[in-house]
Amino acid sequence: MTNNQWVLARTPLGGFPHEDDFRWQTGALPEIEPGQLLTKTIYLSLDPYQWGRRRSGVEVPGDVCHGRTVSQVVSSRREGFEEGDFVFNTNGWQSFGLTGEGISHFGYMYPRKLDAKAASISTAIGVMGMLGLTAYSGLLVQCQPQPGETVIISAASGGVGQVACQLAKIAGCRVIGIAGNAQKLKFLSDVVGVDHCVSHLSEDFEDELRTLCPDGCDVYFENVGGKVYEAVLPLLNKNSRITVCGMIS
C-alpha cells in the first residue's frame, strides 16, 4: 500500500492559502513500533487554527500538514487496540499514520477508541469533538443564555457556529445567525433552524442587523471580528455576555 500525503511546501506568506503552499507526495507505509498503532485515515477535520500553525512556524516546510482525524486500525502493537478498531487520533493530511508511543511530530496524543454503535464515528471530529466542546463551553458555560434572550452568532454556518446556534435554540433563545453567501443563509434557515439570518456581505448589513434586534442583543458568540464585531457592539444590552472564539476576518 502507498501512503499519500500533503506536506507544507513553504511557510505561507499570509492571507488566504495558495496551492503553492502545499505539495503532494507518496511513499511507503511507516514501520510500526511497540506501543504504536498504524491507522488508515477515514475522516479529516480542516479547522481555522491549522492556518495559524503554518504561518507561525509551528509547522515547517516538509512537514505533513496537521489535522485531527478519525481512523481505522490497520495494525496494532498497542495493548487494548485491535485491527479494525476506529480511533480518534491525529494522522494529519495523509492516508496512513502512526499513533502512540514516540510519535511527536503532531504533539503526542493518546488514541481514543470510538464506539461506532453509540454515534456516527464522524462526530468525533464534529459535534462530539473539539467543535462541539468549543461551542458548548463558549456558549452555555461562559455566556449562560436564558430563555427569551437574543443571541447573535457570527460565522454561524461554520463548524462551531452551527453547533452554537442549535445549543442556543435548545436553551430557548431567539437566534440570529450571521454568514456570507445565499447558500450558507439557506443552510442556517432550513437545516440549522435559526430564527433569522443576515449576510455580512450585504450593503445594508448593519441596518438589517439592527432591525432584527429591536430589543438589543444579550449574548454574542464572536467568530469573525472586524466589521461584523463593530456592527454587533452597539446592539449589546447592559449585562450582555460575549464569547470571543475566533477572529477569522
Question: Residues of each region from the PLM?
Answer:
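NAD(P)H dinucleotide-binding glycine-rich loop of Rossmann-like/cofactor-binding domains
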Residues: 65-72, 83-155, 197
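Short glycine-centered segments of the SAM/dcSAM-binding site in methyltransferase folds
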Residues: 86, 150, 174, 240-242
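Glycine-rich phosphate-binding loop and adjacent beta-alpha segment
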Residues: 188, 227-249
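Glycine-rich beta-strand-centered segment in the early N-terminal region that forms part
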Residues: 28-46, 52-93
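Short amphipathic alpha-helix with an adjacent loop that forms part of the alpha/beta core around
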Residues: 204-215
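Mid-domain Rossmann-like dinucleotide-binding core that forms the NAD(H)/NADP(H) cofactor-binding site
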Residues: 125-203
